């Protein structure tokens, strides 16, 4: 099988090239009995998960040419440990990553159990959720579909993500303190739209009439404070894609949710605080964002005319139809600021007005469910007798992309045909759909029969289903992207059952959690086969199966019974190769060294507010060392005592670091600093640090640093 995967990856590379384009035990006795059911112990932690800033395909848009070329601001894992008065505990982690893959969750649990033992933190009580930023490095899944454009499995990136999540949880574990939670809900408008209204409109009229909009406008915020009322953390849930940064971006970014976290943590910790240092931690968790875009100006053709409503095309071409964010002329950086800022401002408002006391037990249920042949019974089968899920398959519209990022090839949403030779060929050599598979997936025209590949399918087929209750807050961890209406139906299903034992439950979708299985559209949305329907892997009854199985988990909480643990998924370790060549050697020009200046700052004319300071260094490949919990750059201010103080680093919004390979084979590192209005007048400098591989026959790396000339800000 490994040889066949190697063959397929090699073939993909060929086709693209020709234009087809701490290791110690920590005591677990860290909790005390609390006196009532609204008192908890809560700990928080944050850690860097930023991956390779050079030469690595980015996860989300599946665009072969979207390769990392620097860092806008770093990506982080934010962890929360909750313990109730009986000692029951649960963990919620929000990561600035596109999603959580099965392999990540399994590795994180293994690592936690090596530290804490086998029973404290398990698959049952640890929930990992991705924000769905499309501006992070790919290659952290061993399932082939999610690694084709990444050229396989990048273990160094995978390890960085897993280690960062574990360290965030360890920090949270060590910081638990008596605490309480308050919550508040409210509506946030002008921050999300439905990107597939044609599919949404296919849902029943009476169901649509129950809601004010075709996307969820509701935001839920959890305020976490100590027993004196001093807040130290917050979690927000709001469904919107992290696609404010489009597929022309090459800088690592947390997108709008990462920026919202950055804003709140700066607000709470002080503007002079450096990112990721706490103590206040704010997570902007993902929810049912499947058909929800942050590009609120909507899709238009490049000539200014509206895109076709059904197919999102312009003159029959998907690549001409783009949705723009609210930034000036659709500027993606400004759009990220606006949508992220809107989420922060609304969350802060709800946080400051939170009055609903969270009280009750911490409970959790988890099962591993094989999802390729689930019999779906009434009332979840959409009235179809004998309804089942199917082995995984991707439809034609999957390759068409969305208005947030049209596909690389001319597929059309809602169209069942293509003449594109690349995807026809790839789909043909993987597996031919059987008549049974074709019938099961109908009306989806199968492009890539990912579930029929033997012996290992190209997508996960055993789903981790999980519910965690924090008092009346119910977190439903879904392993994929539920559309707006799918999320509403699932919340209603869980609320109806769990409301038998929890008064006034607040049911929340925690999206892209624990593994990733594509999209989950409603039965009706599936029929029109836009992108979300074509990417609903297990067929038209996928949502019904999720409703049915989550109903069973909710019922087990009501009954006080244990959930069936289910079938643990296959071990994927070592199944997927990596075809990105390693860094062979770094070189600098003959009369220069790493860290020397290529283009310096202005030393004669002072800079002003809103101007951008630029300096270019001779550097090395950013893949050598990811500078985890550190920085490739600093902006330093000269103090009156003659010492330098770092005021910004590469985790800050105001800086950008670009990596580029010069034609002569050396790396150029460009650092931009846009001077914000809160910057104090004075003398400044910019530094760049990194590691160079000087010897092609050794893996040893050499640290280097470059420092700009001093310059003034007036």
UniProtKB/Swiss-Prot annotation:
<protein>
    <recommendedName>
        <fullName>Neutral ceramidase A</fullName>
        <ecNumber>3.5.1.23</ecNumber>
    </recommendedName>
</protein>
<feature type="glycosylation site" description="N-linked (GlcNAc...) asparagine">
    <location>
        <position position="700"/>
    </location>
</feature>
<feature type="glycosylation site" description="N-linked (GlcNAc...) asparagine">
    <location>
        <position position="218"/>
    </location>
</feature>
<feature type="glycosylation site" description="N-linked (GlcNAc...) asparagine">
    <location>
        <position position="373"/>
    </location>
</feature>
<dbReference type="InterPro" id="IPR031331">
    <property type="entry name" value="NEUT/ALK_ceramidase_C"/>
</dbReference>
<keyword id="KW-0746">Sphingolipid metabolism</keyword>
<dbReference type="InterPro" id="IPR006823">
    <property type="entry name" value="Ceramidase_alk"/>
</dbReference>
<feature type="signal peptide">
    <location>
        <begin position="1"/>
        <end position="23"/>
    </location>
</feature>
<keyword id="KW-0732">Signal</keyword>
<comment type="function">
    <text>Hydrolyzes the sphingolipid ceramide into sphingosine and free fatty acid at an optimal pH of 3.0. Has no activity toward glycosphingolipids, such as GalCer and Galbeta1-3GalNAcbeta1-4(NeuAcalpha2-3)Galbeta1-4Glcbeta1-1'Cer or sphingomyelin.</text>
</comment>
<comment type="similarity">
    <text>Belongs to the neutral ceramidase family.</text>
</comment>
<keyword id="KW-0964">Secreted</keyword>
<keyword id="KW-0325">Glycoprotein</keyword>
<dbReference type="GO" id="GO:0005576">
    <property type="term" value="C:extracellular region"/>
</dbReference>
<feature type="glycosylation site" description="N-linked (GlcNAc...) asparagine">
    <location>
        <position position="246"/>
    </location>
</feature>
<dbReference type="GO" id="GO:0046512">
    <property type="term" value="P:sphingosine biosynthetic process"/>
</dbReference>
<feature type="glycosylation site" description="N-linked (GlcNAc...) asparagine">
    <location>
        <position position="571"/>
    </location>
</feature>
<feature type="glycosylation site" description="N-linked (GlcNAc...) asparagine">
    <location>
        <position position="353"/>
    </location>
</feature>
<dbReference type="GO" id="GO:0016020">
    <property type="term" value="C:membrane"/>
</dbReference>
<feature type="glycosylation site" description="N-linked (GlcNAc...) asparagine">
    <location>
        <position position="416"/>
    </location>
</feature>
<dbReference type="InterPro" id="IPR031329">
    <property type="entry name" value="NEUT/ALK_ceramidase_N"/>
</dbReference>
<keyword id="KW-0378">Hydrolase</keyword>
<dbReference type="InterPro" id="IPR038445">
    <property type="entry name" value="NCDase_C_sf"/>
</dbReference>
<dbReference type="Pfam" id="PF17048">
    <property type="entry name" value="Ceramidse_alk_C"/>
</dbReference>
<keyword id="KW-0443">Lipid metabolism</keyword>
<dbReference type="GO" id="GO:0017040">
    <property type="term" value="F:N-acylsphingosine amidohydrolase activity"/>
</dbReference>
<dbReference type="GO" id="GO:0006672">
    <property type="term" value="P:ceramide metabolic process"/>
</dbReference>
<dbReference type="GO" id="GO:0046514">
    <property type="term" value="P:ceramide catabolic process"/>
</dbReference>
<feature type="active site" description="Nucleophile">
    <location>
        <position position="293"/>
    </location>
</feature>
<feature type="glycosylation site" description="N-linked (GlcNAc...) asparagine">
    <location>
        <position position="610"/>
    </location>
</feature>
<dbReference type="Pfam" id="PF04734">
    <property type="entry name" value="Ceramidase_alk"/>
</dbReference>
<dbReference type="GO" id="GO:0042759">
    <property type="term" value="P:long-chain fatty acid biosynthetic process"/>
</dbReference>
């Amino acid at each position: 099988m490994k040889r066949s995967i190697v063959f397929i990856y090699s073939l993909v590379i060929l086709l693209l090239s020709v234009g087809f384009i701490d290791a110690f035990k920590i005591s677990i006795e860290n909790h005390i009995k609390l006196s009532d059911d609204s008192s908890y112990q809560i700990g928080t932690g944050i850690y860097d998960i930023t991956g390779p800033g050079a030469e690595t395909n980015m996860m989300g848009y599946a665009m072969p040419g979207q390769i990392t070329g620097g860092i806008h601001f770093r990506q982080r894992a934010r962890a929360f440990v909750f313990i109730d008065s009986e000692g029951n505990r649960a963990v919620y982690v929000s990561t600035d990553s596109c999603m959580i893959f099965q392999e990540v969750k399994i590795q994180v649990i293994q690592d936690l159990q090596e530290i804490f033992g086998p029973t404290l933190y398990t698959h049952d009580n640890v929930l990992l959720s991705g924000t769905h930023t499309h501006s992070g490095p790919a290659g952290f899944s061993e399932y082939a579909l999610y690694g084709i454009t990444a050229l396989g499995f990048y273990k160094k990136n995978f390890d960085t993500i897993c280690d960062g999540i574990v360290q965030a949880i360890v920090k949270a574990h060590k910081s638990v303190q008596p605490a309480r939670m308050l919550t508040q809900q409210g509506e946030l408008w002008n921050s999300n739209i439905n990107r597939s209204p044609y599919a949404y409109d296919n849902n029943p009229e009476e169901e649509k009439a129950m809601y004010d909009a075709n996307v969820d406008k509701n935001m839920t915020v959890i305020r976490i404070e100590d027993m004196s009322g001093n807040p130290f953390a917050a979690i927000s849930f709001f469904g919107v894609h992290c696609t404010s940064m489009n597929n022309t971006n090459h800088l690592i970014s947390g997108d709008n949710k990462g920026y919202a976290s950055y804003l709140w943590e700066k607000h709470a910790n002080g503007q002079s605080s450096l990112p990721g240092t706490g103590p206040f931690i704010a997570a902007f968790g993902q929810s049912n964002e499947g058909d929800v875009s942050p590009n609120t100006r909507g899709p238009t053709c490049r000539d200014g005319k509206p895109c076709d409503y059904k197919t999102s095309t312009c003159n029959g071409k998907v690549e001409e139809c783009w949705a723009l964010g609210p930034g000036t002329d659709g500027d993606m950086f400004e759009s990220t600021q606006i949508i992220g800022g809107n989420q922060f401002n609304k969350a802060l408002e709800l946080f400051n007005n939170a009055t609903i006391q969270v009280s009750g037990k911490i409970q959790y249920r988890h099962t591993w469910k094989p999802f390729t042949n689930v019999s779906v019974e009434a009332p979840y089968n959409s009235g179809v007798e004998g309804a089942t899920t199917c082995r995984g398959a991707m439809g034609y519209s999957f390759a068409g992309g969305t208005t947030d990022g049209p596909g690389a090839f001319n597929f059309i949403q809602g169209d069942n045909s293509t003449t594109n030779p690349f995807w026809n060929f790839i789909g043909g050599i993987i597996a031919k759909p059987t008549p049974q598979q074709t019938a099961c997936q109908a009306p989806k025209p199968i492009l890539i029969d990912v579930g029929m590949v033997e012996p290992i399918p190209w997508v996960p087929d055993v789903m981790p289903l999980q519910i965690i209750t924090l008092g009346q807050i119910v977190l439903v961890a879904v392993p994929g992207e539920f559309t707006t209406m799918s999320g509403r139906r699932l919340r209603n299903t869980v609320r109806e059952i769990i409301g038998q034992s929890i008064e006034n439950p607040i049911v929340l979708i925690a999206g892209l959690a624990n593994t990733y299985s594509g999209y989950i559209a409603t039965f009706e949305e599936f029929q029109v086969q836009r992108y979300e329907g074509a990417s609903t892997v297990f067929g038209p009854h996928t949502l019904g199966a999720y409703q049915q199985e989550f109903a069973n988990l909710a019922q087990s909480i009501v009954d006080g019974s244990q959930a069936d643990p289910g079938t643990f998924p296959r071990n994927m370790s070592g199944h997927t190769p990596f075809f990105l060549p390693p860094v062979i050697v770094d070189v600098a020009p003959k009369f220069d060294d790493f860290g020397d200046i290529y283009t310096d700052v202005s030393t004669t004319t002072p800079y002003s507010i809103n101007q951008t300071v630029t300096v270019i260094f001779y550097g090395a490949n950013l893949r050598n060392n990811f500078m985890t919990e550190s920085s490739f750059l600093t902006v330093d201010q000269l103090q009156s005592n003659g010492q330098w103080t770092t005021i910004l680093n590469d985790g800050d919004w105001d800086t950008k670091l670009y990596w580029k390979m010069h034609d002569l084979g050396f790396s150029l590192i460009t650092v931009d600093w846009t001077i914000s209005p809160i910057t104090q007048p004075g003398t400044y400098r910019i530094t760049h640090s990194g590691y160079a591989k000087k010897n092609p026959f050794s893996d040893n790396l050499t640290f280097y640093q470059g420092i700009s000339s001093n310059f003034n800000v007036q």
